[in-house]
């Protein structure tokens, strides 16, 4: 296991060492080019620099906040409306590191639980790091104060499965991070059994 930042750093370095891949930074996409056909085909991109470029296939991998559906609609491709569902959850996380020489107490199953009013999980990473995460309803004000470090640690102390990791001498690496406004989105480029566009794909994050 690895922290997301570590994973992305390793992935980027791996990609940069691939001679068949070109990474361009600071270049924004403003729209797509298409060819006229029974099923429209996306053939290229427009950039915020005013330039454009042709491609055989385009994958919009910029996640749930992507403007890709708008790019398609702007050139007359009717994209089905996305389905959006609010998770109604707030996450609170804090990251820790164990002392050198202390092994993470990793077992063969996740360290997680659902108490009904509170979910928790311990997620281990690289180099002796791990995080403890709590999830609560975004309408339950009982745990809103858990963003306070002392309150967070008092909740950790009350959950044996989480406390075990802290008791190994873990040192906090961060304060308490919160994340809310979590929306699940479902997008499709099909209407019934028919695809609405060729040469273009969207994936989430």
Question: Which sequence ranges carry the predicted segments?
Answer:
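Active-site-adjacent segment of FAD-dependent monooxygenases/related oxidoreductases
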Residues: 1-10, 93
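Conserved acidic functional residues
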Residues: 60, 204-205
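N-terminal Rossmann-like dinucleotide/flavin-binding domain of flavoprotein oxidoreductases
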Residues: 7-21
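Mixed-charge, polar/low-complexity N-terminal
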Residues: 3-4, 59, 76-77, 104-105, ...
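Predominantly flavin-linked oxidoreductase catalytic cores and closely associated redox partners
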Residues: 17-161
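FAD/FMN-dependent oxidoreductases across multiple families
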Residues: 143-204
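Solvent-exposed, flexible loop/coil residues
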Residues: 6, 36, 100, 193, ...
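Conserved short hydrophobic patches within well-ordered secondary structure
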Residues: 6, 42, 72, 202-204
